[in-house]
């Protein structure tokens, strides 16, 4: 389309649309991970905080989105779609919603690219953050587990709404006008979710040992199978080497589940085979091979490095405490298994792994239990004067008893209470406080008639004083 944009504005607009598409995929997929996402705001944003939003990217989602884009951008007649589907443990699948980012031919040539388009795209992304959490798929994603998982797929082309069933609804997130067209972000979602209940109760147990899902078709026969991936938090440095688009022969389909964060990823497969560089890295194999990734072409040493400090957690700690530094290295780690995986859980010890920067580590590991800065020595117990006065009667009678068995009795004396009403509980005190007694000064009943009689009798009682006062005035 012929436009009056200069080269710099055209370059900026393409960059804005590209990163908006990537952030759109991140927001949609992260909203289906099944956990709430809390991100702190920063007073000094970095260059990676596009559209004034601190959205931490998950590397695997970014890789799949870039592979789907393949160097092209959403334009007129070229829509980017994110399909969210559900798959049960029995092999049944159901499409839940389809998010579509498209552009039409309606242009706004007077709009400024540098600030106006950028700020409106930021508002559209904020609207997407809110709307992704009000559709029915969000409620299902919060409850996913071993019974079903949520999958996503990114593709370019015509929107495929036939899988949503009858009576699906659509919602428009918003539109942003640009000099080359109007960007539109919309969603079509399923409202008939009776699939889970009907199939769950209609299926009868087999009489013989028949595999129930043997003849169940794949959800997408023309594409590669969807492999459930272990949950990874946003911004986590997984250390996975993602292959390029040319190296991967799979269509842009992947999946994820909301298993708890993996406690340790076992390096290699069952036999410890390192990951080949030309294999696509995602799914359960990526979880098993996340640590040991090496390239035979370069001569670097292949060391097993953990993906993040938050992903590793000690599973077996003896009840007797840590005995020696050798026991720390012998600590057993267990791999977290994803849904539908029947492989045995292998155990690996850190003694078989190479420790990075081992030459800089001290030879004798000093445990935290023996560190005086972490665990200071216990100070001698000093008996306070108040405690001594409270226990003076009991300690004098039986000094041989255990001091920890004594109980300190403190009298409850609420404010503004009288000693004669004790003992009393808190409820009684509250009722007494709500209905206080009347002041004694208000209880004296002085009538108006008696006051008038007293005033009339004053001159008669003090006649001499009044006469003396009148004489002084003359």
Swiss-Prot record:
Residues 127-134 are annotated as: Important for interaction with ATG101. Residues 295-324, 368-402 are annotated as: Disordered. Pfam families: ATG13. Residues 305-321 have a biased composition (Polar residues). Gene3D superfamilies: HORMA domain (3.30.900.10). One of its GO terms (molecular function) is protein kinase regulator activity. Keywords: Acetylation, Autophagy, Cytoplasm, Phosphoprotein. GO terms for cellular component: Atg1/ULK1 kinase complex; autophagosome; cytosol; phagophore assembly site. Phosphorylated by ULK1, ULK2 and mTOR. Phosphorylation status depends on nutrient-rich conditions; dephosphorylated during starvation or following treatment with rapamycin. ULK1-mediated phosphorylation of ATG13 at Ser-318 is required for efficient clearance of depolarized mitochondria. Coiled coil: none annotated. It is found in: Cytoplasm, Cytosol; Preautophagosomal structure. The keyword Lipoprotein does not apply. The modification N-acetylmethionine is found at residue 1. The modification Phosphoserine is found at residues 318-319, 324. Its main location: cytoplasm. A motif (LIR) lies at residues 407-410. GO terms for biological process: autophagosome assembly; mitophagy; piecemeal microautophagy of the nucleus; protein localization to phagophore assembly site. The LIR motif (LC3-interacting region) is required for the interaction with the ATG8 family proteins GABARAP, GABARAPL, GABARAPL2, and MAP1LC3A. Part of a complex consisting of ATG13, ULK1 and RB1CC1. Interacts with ATG101. Interacts with ULK1 (via C-terminus). Interacts with ULK2 (via C-terminus). Interacts (via the LIR motif) with GABARAP, GABARAPL, GABARAPL2. Interacts (via the LIR motif) with MAP1LC3A, MAP1LC3B and MAP1LC3C. Interacts with TAB2 and TAB3. Interacts with C9orf72. Belongs to the ATG13 family. Metazoan subfamily. This is Autophagy-related protein 13. The lineage of its organism: Eukaryota, Metazoa, Chordata, Craniata, Vertebrata. The gene is ATG13.
């Amino acid at each position: 389309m012929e436009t009056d944009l200069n080269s710099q504005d055209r370059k900026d607009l393409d960059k804005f649309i590209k990163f908006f598409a990537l952030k759109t995929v991140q927001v949609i997929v992260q909203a289906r991970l099944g956990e709430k996402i809390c991100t702190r705001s920063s007073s000094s944003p970095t260059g990676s905080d596009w559209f004034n939003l601190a959205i931490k990217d998950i590397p695997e989602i970014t890789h799949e989105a870039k592979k789907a884009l393949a160097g092209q951008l959403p334009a007129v007649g070229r829509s980017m779609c994110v399909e969210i589907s559900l798959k049960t443990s029995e092999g049944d699948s159901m499409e839940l919603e389809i998010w579509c980012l498209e552009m039409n031919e309606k242009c706004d040539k007077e709009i400024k690219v540098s600030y106006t388009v950028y700020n409106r795209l930021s508002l559209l992304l904020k609207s997407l953050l809110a709307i992704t959490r009000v559709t029915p798929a969000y409620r299902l994603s919060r409850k996913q587990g071993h019974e079903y998982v949520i999958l996503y797929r990114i593709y370019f082309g015509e929107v495929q709404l036939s899988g949503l069933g009858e009576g699906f609804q659509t919602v428009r997130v918003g539109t942003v006008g640009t000099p080359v067209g109007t960007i539109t972000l919309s969603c079509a979602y399923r409202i008939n979710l009776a699939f889970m209940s009907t199939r769950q109760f209609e299926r009868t147990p087999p009489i013989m040992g028949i595999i129930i899902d043997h003849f169940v078709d794949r959800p997408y026969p023309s594409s590669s199978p969807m492999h459930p991936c272990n949950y990874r938090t946003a911004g986590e440095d997984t250390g996975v080497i993602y292959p390029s688009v040319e190296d991967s022969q799979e269509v842009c389909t992947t999946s994820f589940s909301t298993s708890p964060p993996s406690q340790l990823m076992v390096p290699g497969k069952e036999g410890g085979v390192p990951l080949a560089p030309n294999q696509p890295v995602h799914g359960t194999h990526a979880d098993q091979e996340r640590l040991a990734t090496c390239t035979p072409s370069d001569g670097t040493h292949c060391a097993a490095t953990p993906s993040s400090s938050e992903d590793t957690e000690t599973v077996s700690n003896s009840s007797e405490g840590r005995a020696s530094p050798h026991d720390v290295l012998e600590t057993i780690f267990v791999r977290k298994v994803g849904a539908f995986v029947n492989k045995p859980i292998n155990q690996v010890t850190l003694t078989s792994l190479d420790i990075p920067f081992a030459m800089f580590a001290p030879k004798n590991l000093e445990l935290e239990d023996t560190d005086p800065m972490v665990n200071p020595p216990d100070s001698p117990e000093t008996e306070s004067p108040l405690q001594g006065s409270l226990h003076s009667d009991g300690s004098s009678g039986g000094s041989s008893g255990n001091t920890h068995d004594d109980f300190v009795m403190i009298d409850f004396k609420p404010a503004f209470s009288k000693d004669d009403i004790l003992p009393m509980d808190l409820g009684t005190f509250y009722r007494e406080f709500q209905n206080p007694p009347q002041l004694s000064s208000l209880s004296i009943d002085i009538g108006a008639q008696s006051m008038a009689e007293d005033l009339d009798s004053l001159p008669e009682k003090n006649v001499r004083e009044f006469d003396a006062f009148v004489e002084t005035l003359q």
